[in-house]
Amino acid sequence: MIKLYGIGLSFNVSKVRYCLNYLNLKYDWAQTNPIAGENQSAEFLNICPTGKIPAIEIDGLKLFESNSINRYLATINHSPIYPQDAKKRAIVDAWMDYVAIHVAHALGRVLFNRMFAPMTGQKVDQESIRVGLEFLDKYFPILEKQLSQNPYLAGKEFSLADINLLAILDPCELAQISIDRYPSLKKWRSGLQSQPFYQKCYKDYSQFVLDAVNAKAGK
């Protein structure tokens, strides 16, 4: 039995959902909304001591952190999206970490201040937006170069690194971040968004988020 805790708006949760879908694994969905404080309940903290989403229960194992969850899922299912070969696996790990540590952090700065801060009545930090965009102007060309030379982020084969980046880029339109200057990155993204593992979650991520926000506001 697999039980996933999270919220549909989170790109880190999306990472795990894409992985589960790609591996054709059935799971129970436990809506856990941090904005409502549901991640601080005693029940959830017993699953995830850090109080962060996503978290997962699988055959008695309680696990958190999206990258760790996906690595575990791919490993126990002997999937090539997380290679057995140590060298190939290291390359996948390197790109997974690059996306999670650098790209996600920079994009998150912009997304929070352009969308979630105004939505929740918090102060918008224009300097944080500037810094985030400045970093993305450094990071996107690196991704563009890699994807202009390879069909996938870690090389010739689709991997967890692609799932990571695909999920991280989901909020680009909401954050008013364009990747039009990066044709290889844009083509790669469009190709994966048409795949069943993605479509099972979202036909259109931006519209999904806007619908959720409008529903909450009673519009």
List PLM regions with ranges:
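Conserved beta-strand edge residues that scaffold enzyme active sites
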Residues: P34-I35, A161, S206
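GST-like domain detector, emphasizing the conserved glutathione-binding G-site
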Residues: M1-R130, K219
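Generic structural signal for helix capping and beta-alpha/helix-loop junctions
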Residues: S14, G37, R189, V209-L210
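Acidic/histidine-enriched, glycine/proline-rich intrinsically disordered or flexible terminal extensions
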Residues: Y205-K219
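Active-site-flanking alpha-helical
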Residues: A74, I168-L169, Y202
